[in-house]
């Protein structure tokens, strides 16, 4: 039994050694390892409050239309969609990492101040939202949320996504922002 374990350990050590050597060689020569495949969040804690599927399983098309005075809302989804609600608290200096969503996302800043940046904005202009304000992300493009203030910030986030789809898709740093 110990021989197979040793063989697996040896293979793992060779693979890890090869990775270390590549990174070391790149650092020594100044060569680039390329942009990371994604960026990670830091200084935040999220709690999924709930997720539910909306639609008729026999129809597989979800439709809602509401017109009242000057107000009009319409949602159509094929196939059915999920709605998820999440609470995210960002500590001072916390950030979401670059990411995107498969559908629209409604963000309400409950307490504190949040700053949002879009990957497709070459000027990296900040969009600042404070307690009581909202931010709409239409989905499908990368963005980052940052708490650039000195106090915690709490957000309630409502996601609309295809049924059973991931709510967040990590994205590489687009390189348009100085941070």
List PLM regions with ranges:
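Short acidic-glycine-tyrosine-enriched beta hairpin
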Residues: 90, 121-140
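Glycine- and acidic-residue-biased ligand/ion/polar-headgroup-sensing regions
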Residues: 101-122
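Bacterial N-terminal signal peptides that target proteins for export
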Residues: 1-8
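A short, N-terminal "cap"/entry segment at the start of jelly-roll beta-barrel domains
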Residues: 19-82, 128, 171-179
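Bacterial N-terminal signal peptides
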Residues: 9-17
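Ligand-binding loop in jelly-roll beta-barrel domains
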Residues: 129-130, 139-166
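Short beta-strand His + acidic residue motifs that chelate non-heme Fe in jelly-roll/DSBH
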Residues: 98, 116-117, 125, 137, ...
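Secreted/periplasmic proteins that engage bacterial cell-wall peptidoglycan
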Residues: 66-72, 83-108
